[in-house]
Amino acid sequence: MNLTEAYLLLAVMLAVVAVVSVLFKGESGLIAPLIFVAGLITALVAGLGFRLREVTEGPFVFVDTLMWVLCGAAFSYLLYVNGTFQFLFAKVVGKKRSPAAQMFILILFIGLPGMITGTALASVATTGLMAGRYLLDKGMEKSKVVEVVTVGALMGMLLPPLCVPAMAPTIARQGLYPGAFEGYFLPILILALPALIVYCALAGRRVLGEWEADGNVEKTGSAVCLIPLAVVAVLVLCYNFLYFLIPYYGGYPVIYLIGFVLALIFKCKGANPLIAAADGIRTVAVELALILAYASVVETFNLVGVNGTLSAQMEIAGINGAVIALVLGLLVLAGGLLLGTPFAYVVGALATYLVSNSNYGSYELPMMAVGAAIAMSMFLALRGSLAETVGETLGVTGVTGTEVVKRNIIFTLVLTAAIVVFLVAGSSLKFLMI
């Protein structure tokens, strides 16, 4: 394949996804299945016929990842319906703190389901809904409520132990299946934490004002309901940092299953486990559909020769791996900004092979940074942004993602800078992977 053909096929894929992104206004749930169709069209244009097998087999690499996220979603939603999160929320708002400290604790509370599942929408549908309704009832300006829940959901997705957008490229790296999102606890924490601290310091007083303790929030049960969370936290930390001392006990699916069973025993109120699990899975379905579509694009680019041709040309040209990672990472951000998160995933699929190949042997953290750029596109997107989803969930209209971003320029720049650092210097920061 010559370079012109590679660019043509790349343009076909990007054009199809761009068109459906515009037509469906960034609705990820509608666009994700159409990305598979874009893969079929690209294969047809390449003269390879109707290649259903290749377009659909890529997502199977994420079967383990799906289990991690689905088990986490079932566990976190059970904590929502059995009263554990309500008990925690009463503690969050029941004490007087400085605005910055209160914002920090509130963001961590909202982000908790996101940390467990690696998704933003799990937070929006549970703790975000809970905190958002409370703040609206307290008379807070609607745009500020949407902002707090949006940032909380974004931070929850980015903070460890899991981050679905970062898991996609790190696991799919250069087609070398299977991969694993292990060793990334400290790197993803270091990437996200500075932006979180900056946001809380700058937005605490602006958004919350002088925070007053509220002891009237309804709560049931006792601190015993926190046992499942505590056990899961200990098991996650041991799994990530004491793996050389403790025998392997099954990873995240088993950890979350243990938490799920404990949450049926130590609870504030009764909950149907089957309904909780099903509802929890629904909260993460769209984001999981996107990584399956992403895997389909990776496989399609491999099939039609786009990845191999472009990678070979860059190798021949002697382009530095850090430059390739930086340019493609910024293209992910730009594509997500203009056309939404599904388009960012498609550009990220191209970046997966090119960045890993150009940084062979030390590609782990640049790949994580590409995933973080995809995650950030949910915050930046002009259509189908995370803020719009939050507004729909809370029943708030007229608040756009652009408005939230404009009010938090410094936060946005700090997070972008952290992503750039890992894109450019990720090879030198590999010592952070434990």
Label each residue range with its predicted role.
Residues M1-L70, L78, F89-A90, L202-E212, ...:
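N-terminal alpha-helical transmembrane segments of multi-pass membrane transport
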Residues M1-V17, V37, I41-A43, G183-A276, ...:
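Long, contiguous bundles of hydrophobic transmembrane helices that form the permeation core
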Residues N2-A11, V63-W68, L121-V124, F185-L191, ...:
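Structural signature of hydrophobic alpha-helical transmembrane segments
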Residues G49-G58, T170-A180, F241-Y248, F301-I316, ...:
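Membrane-interface helix termini and inter-helical loops of multi-pass transporters
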Residues G49-Y134, A271-S358:
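Membrane-embedded alpha-helical segments and adjacent helix-loop junctions characteristic
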